[in-house]
Design a protein with these regions (language model features):
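Bacterial Sec-dependent N-terminal signal peptides
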Residues: 1-32, 242-244
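Extended soluble regions of mature proteins
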Residues: 25-244
Length: 244
């Protein structure tokens, strides 16, 4: 009898040890530094906008953080050390996702005004491919999101980072997105640094405070009403809802 107990005990300890090793191979919390590269020539087609763009300023590089744990994720811009004359041409929006309640709070920077949107996590139909690449030391698999006939996005995610999160609030893949790009390469995000940390509660929180909060449907209606008749309104609408 004691022999069976001993064997069972050894087996149990062995299984727990294996589970611990497997679990340690996956990252449940951390901080990712992203770089966003925007090609303004590809983003803006309006002739008036193009006149402001030249070889010296057509590429904008900006930084973002993705801070996450098992239950939430926050994607937010890194403040610029100094602004430049082209900074208004690219917006830094923030996204807080509660992975348990499946809710997302988005703060959009629209012409210097902050708009707060609370809605469910986006449900996107991804096509996962066999294509792989390494980003910041992690093997990533390529996935494709076909939003409509004119908008296709590519994501590279790793299952080594457990939370389903990524740049600009993108989620829905079996792991964390370390690379995201538009089909024409006009906007590209890549992870430059990955830190395995346990973030503080305040570091991963976004609060609307007393600001007015709308849902996605109400935001669409507001933008169409306020800017839909302007010559640049459609382009702004398309750019904004590329991510929403």
């Amino acid at each position: 009898m004691s022999g069976k107990v001993g064997i069972n005990l050894i087996f149990t300890m062995l299984m727990l040890s294996i589970q611990g090793i497997v679990s340690s191979q996956y990252i449940h919390s951390g901080k990712i530094t992203f770089e966003r590269r925007t090609n303004l020539e590809k983003r803006y087609s309006d002739p008036r906008m193009k006149r402001m763009i030249n070889e010296n300023n057509k590429i904008r590089n900006e930084g973002f953080y993705l801070i996450f744990n098992d239950s939430s994720a926050l994607f937010t811009g890194i403040p610029d050390e100094k602004s430049d004359e082209m900074s208004w041409m690219t917006a830094k929006n923030s996204y807080y996702q509660n992975l348990n309640s499946k809710k997302q709070l988005t703060v959009l920077n629209l012409f210097g005004q902050s708009l707060y949107i609370l809605d469910s996590l986006p449900q996107r139909k991804w096509k996962i491919t066999d294509s792989k690449r390494t980003i910041s030391g992690y093997e990533c698999r390529k996935a494709v999101y076909q939003k409509n006939d004119s908008t296709r996005l590519y994501a590279w995610y790793t299952s080594a980072l457990v939370p389903s999160a990524g740049p600009e609030g993108f989620c829905g893949l079996p792991g964390t997105i370390l690379g995201l790009a538009t089909e024409d390469g006009g906007i590209i995000y890549f992870a430059k640094k990955i830190e395995v940390i346990m973030p503080k509660k305040d570091d991963i929180l976004l609060d609307a405070g007393k600001n007015k909060v709308v849902n996605l449907k109400e935001l669409r209606e507001k933008i169409e009403k306020d800017y839909g008749n302007t010559p640049w309104g459609k382009r702004m609408f398309d750019d904004l809802f590329r991510w929403l």
